[in-house]
């Protein structure tokens, strides 16, 4: 057999995609999901797009999340936990403003700064469809209880009614702002609310 007729071994192909290992893939995926949601909303998020954004194989997200909804629940849980920290910090600040006003301002800022995540938390079926003993339900309830506690400390009649009325005002403003109906910063409207 001469040199020209020898079979050549196929050259090994190298992948264009970088091989990337995350020390904390779960955290990297959640961060990538938050970024994607902030830019494009939750409706466009797929586990494949998330894997590309995180620089990992398309199967990698399935090591941590059963499906897309499982990932969205994890993002929403973190959102409610962050909202609770924000509200708790505002309530503990003290100062001339009432606790309700401080919490209201913090709530409005959170909603305004996290529009698409806020939509995921409050304008999706995730919380209503979650089992009451789930991490998501508990995280959502904690944020409401912080608001309820602050309103009831003020001695308003019927803390559930008052807290729900305060929450309805805040939520309504955040959603109106998110949908483009309120041009000014939400905190500027704080003095007009029935707090």
Where in the sequence are the language-model features?
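Amphipathic alpha-helical packing segments from all-alpha helical-bundle domains
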Residues: 130-156, 160-164, 191-195
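N-terminal intrinsically disordered/low-complexity leader segments
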Residues: 1-24
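Amphipathic C-terminal alpha-helical segment
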Residues: 166-184
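Hydrophobic alpha-helical connector segments
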Residues: 74, 88-116, 141-142, 166
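Short secondary-structure transition hinges
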Residues: 109-146, 175, 179
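Amphipathic alpha-helical interaction segments
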Residues: 70, 102, 106, 120, ...
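An amphipathic alpha-helix adjacent to DNA-recognition modules
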Residues: 23-34, 38, 43-44, 55, ...
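Append "Primarily bacterial transcriptional regulators
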Residues: 45-52, 61
């Amino acid at each position: 057999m001469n040199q020209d007729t020898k079979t050549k071994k196929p050259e090994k192909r190298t992948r264009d995609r970088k091989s990337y290992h995350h020390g904390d893939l779960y955290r990297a995926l959640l961060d990538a999901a938050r970024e994607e949601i902030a830019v494009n909303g939750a409706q466009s998020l797929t586990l494949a797009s998330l894997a590309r954004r995180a620089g990992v194989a398309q199967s990698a997200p399935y090591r941590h999340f059963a499906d897309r909804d499982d990932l969205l629940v994890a993002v929403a849980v973190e959102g409610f936990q962050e909202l609770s920290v924000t509200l708790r910090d505002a309530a503990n600040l003290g100062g001339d403003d009432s606790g309700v006003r401080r919490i209201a301002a913090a709530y409005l800022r959170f909603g305004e700064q996290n529009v698409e995540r806020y939509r995921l938390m409050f304008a999706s079926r995730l919380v209503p469809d979650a089992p009451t003993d789930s991490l998501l339900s508990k995280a959502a309830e904690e944020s409401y209880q912080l608001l309820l506690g602050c309103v009831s400390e003020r001695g308003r009649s019927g803390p559930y009614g008052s807290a729900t009325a305060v929450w309805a005002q805040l939520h309504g403003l955040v959603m109106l702002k998110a949908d483009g109906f309120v041009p000014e910063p939400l905190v500027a409207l704080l003095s007009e609310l029935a707090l």
